[in-house]
Amino acid sequence: MSGPVRFAVVGSGWRSQFHIRMAKALPERLQVVAVVTLNAAEAERITSTWGVPAVTSIDEALAARPEFVVAAVSWPAMPGVVRQLVAAGVPVYAETPPAPELEGLRALWDEVGASGLVQVGEQYTLMPGHASRLELVRQGVVGRPNSVEIASTHLYHAVSLVRSFLDVDMDEVTVNARAFRAPLADPLTFDGWVPDPQPQPRTTTIATLDFGDGRLGLYDFVENQWWNPLLARRIVVRGSLGEIVDDTVTRLTDGAVVTSPIVYRRTGVDMNLEGNEVVHTSFDGRVVYRNPWTGTRLSEDDIAVASLLTAVGAWVRDEGPEPYPLAQGCQDHAIGLAIEESVRTGSDVRVAKEVWA
């Protein structure tokens, strides 16, 4: 890749600033040429805080000649922003989800799907842990993957992980979901630490995703699970020859049952002065994942976001494949919506072949 990829951002909220921060961390690879805000006061705040140009219209942002545009706006606003950018012939990186509801997904696909200009900001498979597990699954370490249990993130993000580990594309799926309420303390939320947190009713949603041919996803999400430090993240990938449970791999090999860990090399521990970050992961003495951004001290989620941004940059320059096409993002959200519908109705919901399949 020659020179930093130039991109603009539509939106100035919390998620928008993830992308601005990545450009600041990787100036040799990424450059923000404009941020579109709601008004002049917000534009001034963004420029003052981040040192990047800020404008109040998409047309002004496009005048800066970005190679692609990140759409990081509210759910209701997303389809309109995507349509406007595609109409201008500009590649789009749309934050999740690309439209709020199923009819909106279908309408958006009908209008922009054929353009091939839209990628979706689904980064979870690029996080070091998930990328390591996915590499082992692709290498056949646990045989044919048959089931995936995810207890860490919600709806379309979790669905993306399930589909990736099971290697299912646009397969039809039957969803059965239920919700349960129980008291749980919530010491940390989006707004920060809570003084003297007391147990309050919180919802747990459990869903099965039946893709047929023995392939199963098990979705387990507790309200505010992203932030609550009382709740562990769990992933189980079960295959025909063994299973991966978080960072432990048990499988049948050479007629024996063998258990091996996924090992993280982390610097900045004890007397190590290299800085605190993941360098690589290894399995049975061989490296299976390397952090492409060593030296930046990025968090694991930031590593994934930076990797996705640069992958979109490679794609727009015809130097790499589509990172996460619109059709995949639509499918993830359609299945996530089916989980919510099954909870509401108490019945199975079938996700059949859609217009983007």
Segments predicted by a language model, with ranges:
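N-terminal Rossmann-like dinucleotide-binding module
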Residues: 1-50
